[in-house]
């Protein structure tokens, strides 16, 4: 990737949580997702996190549902950028998820027209796919700056600090607090 000027970066981060507070609420309000969680989500986390094997399905839902866009929702999107050597930060937190996503798309459309790159830690494999899926679930058209089904990995206009820190390796530790 060619050198990117810092005044052409939009630093982006999302915060997520489960769509419902408890698995009982999920069962009451969305039986299809409840059955899907019991069939797939529950077993996925038991397989990948053996230390949580003894947790109930409800405990697993509470702990992990926010990590999957099918079972979670976005509660905050924060964006930072540099204008005239001054750092600016904007967070979208008011209203529900749909309002947050609409404001995010408006911002992304504006920076796309200005030739910006997106920047974040694990942005390519978490934030952008999560945003895209939640936008589709909420019937909101994603911004053209976001990757779509036919975008090749090298075509994504995003600088991922996790990738930068790993220097091409997938084995090292690269948690954001370790990088900082």
Report residues per predicted region.
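Metal-dependent phosphoesterase core characteristic of DEDDh/y 3'-5' exonuclease domains
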Residues: 2-7, 72-94, 111-180
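Conserved RNase H-like, two-metal-ion catalytic cores of nucleic-acid enzymes
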Residues: 1-110
């Amino acid at each position: 990737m060619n050198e990117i000027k810092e005044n052409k970066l939009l630093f982006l981060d999302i915060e997520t949580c489960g769509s419902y507070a408890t698995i009982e609420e999920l069962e009451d309000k969305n039986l299809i997702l409840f059955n899907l969680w019991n069939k797939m989500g529950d077993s996925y986390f038991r397989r990948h996190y053996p230390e949580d094997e003894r947790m109930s399905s409800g405990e697993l839902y509470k702990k992990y549902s926010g990590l999957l866009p099918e079972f979670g929702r976005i509660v905050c999107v924060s964006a930072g950028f540099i204008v005239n050597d001054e750092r600016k930060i904007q967070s979208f937190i008011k209203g529900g998820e749909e309002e947050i996503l609409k404001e995010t798309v408006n911002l992304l459309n504006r920076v796309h027209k200005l030739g910006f790159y997106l920047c974040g830690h694990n942005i390519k494999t978490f934030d952008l796919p999560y945003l895209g899926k939640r936008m589709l679930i909420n019937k909101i058209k994603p911004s053209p700056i976001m990757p779509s089904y036919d975008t090749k990995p090298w075509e994504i206009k995003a600088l991922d600090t996790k990738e930068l820190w790993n220097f091409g390796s997938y084995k090292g530790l690269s948690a954001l607090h370790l990088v900082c």
